[in-house]
Structures are given as C-alpha cells and as structure tokens.
Amino acid sequence: MNKFLTALLFALALLCFGCGGQQGASADGKMQVAASFYPMAEFARAVGGDRVAVYTMIGDGIEPHDWEPSARDLTRLAKAKVFVYNGGVEPWAQPAVAAVADDGVQAVEAGQAFMQQLDKSDPHFWLSPRKAAVEVAAVHDAFVKADPEHAAEYKQNAAAYIAKINALDEKLMAVAQNAKIKNFITTHAAFGHLAADYGLRQESIMGLSPQAEPSPAALNKLLGVMQADGIKYVFFETLVSPRIAETIAQAAGAETLVLDPLEGLSEAGRQNGDDYLKIMERNIENLNIALNGK
C-alpha cells in the first residue's frame, strides 16, 4: 500500500493548486461519474444514460484485484460528482473516498448491503443477477441524490435495465433447476454468490485470488470431485491464463469453457460490442452446457 499512499499524497498536493472547471460537470454539462472497474461503469451508464459522462478508473484487460490508483487517477477522481465502486474488490477505494470528500465527490458502494450481511471475502456480487439488480438500484439512488433535477430519467433508465437483469435471473433459474449436475469447476472463486442464489455449488481451482497457485492436494481433490460427479468441463476466465484450467481438464479427460467474471473487458470484447448483459447471457449458456454434461 506504500505505492498508493505516495500517489495519494502527490495527488492531494496537486489539488491544492486547484484543478479548474466546474466540479462534477463535463464540458457538455453532463454529470461526471467515476467508476472503479467495468461492471460498475456499465451500471452507471445504464442508469445515467445521456445525462452522465462515465469513465472507468481500471482500464480494459486489467485484473482489478491488485490494481492501485496513480496520482493522476486520484486527481481525476476529485473532479467527479459521483464515484461508484463495488466494495471489497478495491482496497484503495475507501482511503480515496476519504481523500476527496472535501471536493464534493459523492461515493456509492454499490455492494454495501451485501458487504454488511455476507462474507466480505467474496465481493463478486455483480455475477449474481439478483445481487446485480440491487447494485443498480444503489447507483440509481446515488444519482438521484446528486442530480435530483433528472430523477425521473434515472428512475426510468434503472427500471428498464433491472428488467433486463431480471430476464437473466429467470434464464439462470431455469438452467439451475433443470441441471443434471449441480456443481461446477472455476479458475477462481468468483461465482460463489451466483452459486448460492441459484442452488448450485462452485469448486474453485485457485481460491478468491486469480493469481493464487493451487496445492497438489487441492488439485487431487478437484479431480476426485470431477470423477465422482461426472463433471466434463473446467471453466477459465478471459483476463487470466487458462494454463491451470487446461492442465486439470486434460488430466480429467474434460474440456474447457469460459465463465467470465466480468472484472474487465478484453480489447476484443470491446471491439465486438460486448457488455454486461451479453457476457452474462454467454455465461448462462456455458453453465447450461457444463451442468448438463453436453
């Protein structure tokens, strides 16, 4: 965290000289919104529509768990009207929020309700459609507070987007109810909330950190689970090397599929027009394949 503190002090020094411009508004009058990483930015754009200018602090193709902001990042954050973050994924967020509080930045921890109720070690709430809808509602509430003049638009946008998330919920519920196999193998334990909300069980290769290395005993246990339950697929994700997933799949005579934790878009995904809803659709399709041993 020394790197973060150095950047924080430098950014605060820059702010003392004044940044210029209207706080929280872009040149075209849109409300400036900072989002910590991809799903938070997606939710902010969905709720804000044409009334907001959203920028993502953690760029495309970057794994967010170990990212830390630079002085430039913090200086830009201080110009935002609203800062949207998940909670749990961004250990730097709360110190940053405290640092820019005097600049009028309104922070919303989209997953706050779940951070208070559930195991804080797994903050991947956005991967369960049911919890994602709650996070979108939290973003809506923050925007209405920051910009009450356009509350009706934010309400309409949020309702429309939540309806689309609810459609994902219905599809996933149907897949889970009809599944022949109730557990699945993932690279890292990002899908615990999805599994819990839909009556499934996640078995992870590398725990909550996508960079962790599994022990030989853990690998043997996973192979045993796969054999006992007839699991024919091992999921890997887009921003982390598939090497270990491929090794386990080969040892078990299984195949690999993508289960995207949506922590960031790849460049290819951005060019293809991917978004949260489309990627979650593919996740559900791949879960259907894996849970039925197709």
Please identify what each model-predicted range represents:
Residues M1-K30:
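Short, low-complexity disordered leader/linker segments with a strong preference
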Residues C19-K294:
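Extracytoplasmic metal-acquisition and chelation regions
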